[in-house]
Regions:
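Hydrophobic h-region of N-terminal signal peptides that target proteins for export
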Residues: 15-22
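Bacterial N-terminal signal peptides that target proteins for export
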Residues: 1-10
Length: 213
């Protein structure tokens, strides 16, 4: 075989492997209300209307419309993300990292430290929140270039991608990060933590999931 032929075969194999990995089912939609759409990996549009039990594949993006919400559970560690109205983001996983790439909107996270084998991150154009086992919310205003992260339990780090600053956020604390490079920690105030779209606490939901059938 000639070297160009071998190189061509190698490239095809790598692209095939990436495609297979990207198509891996990483989560499922537990609940959905209103307009909830999926943009499958490789697609340019939000073309799939979500149904209960809908598979979420690595690389998929989700859009939750006005007066709508969705709840997604990750299959490996049973971590849960609740997605509030007017939110868009993409699920991206590697062998050691789980990232939610937020374009806009508000998400509530209950990250299960038990059985978790990957780093859990929430990324916006401005900030990166690196999470261990904790419960927190993330809000990104795409127009203003402002993020707000609020801790409810546990702790996590927030990194401002512009300035390189990092702060640790614990329970009852928040961090406001913006496109000017500012990263401001402060005590959380009443109303900072978004209302749960289901009206249930993530702790109660996690306990229900852990109960044997």
């Amino acid at each position: 075989m000639t070297m160009p032929f071998i190189k061509k075969i190698s490239i095809i194999f790598i692209l095939f492997t990436i495609t297979i990995c990207s198509a891996e089912t990483i989560g499922r939609v537990m609940k959905a209300n209103g307009e909830v759409l999926i943009k499958p990996i490789g697609s340019g549009t939000y073309s799939v209307s979500v149904k209960l039990g809908q598979a979420i594949s690595n690389g998929d993006a989700i859009r939750v419309g006005e007066a709508s919400f969705a709840v997604v559970i990750f299959l490996d560690d049973k971590s849960v993300v609740k997605i509030k109205e007017n939110t868009d983001f993409q699920f991206v996983e590697t062998s050691n990292t789980r990232s939610l790439i937020i374009e806009q909107g508000t998400t509530l996270h209950n990250v299960n430290s038990k059985d978790r084998k990957k780093d859990y991150r929430v990324e916006t154009p401005v900030s990166v929140a690196s999470v261990k086992g904790t419960e927190f919310s993330a809000f990104h205003d795409a127009v203003a270039g402002v993020d707000k992260f609020v801790g409810k339990s546990g702790n996590f780090d927030v990194f401002n991608s512009i300035s390189g600053m990092t702060v640790n956020v614990g329970a009852g604390q928040k961090a406001v990060s913006n496109a000017m490079g500012q990263l401001i920690p402060a005590p959380a105030e009443p109303g900072d933590y978004p209302e749960d779209p289901e009206g249930d606490s993530p702790e109660e939901e996690q306990e229900e999931q852990d109960q044997p059938e």
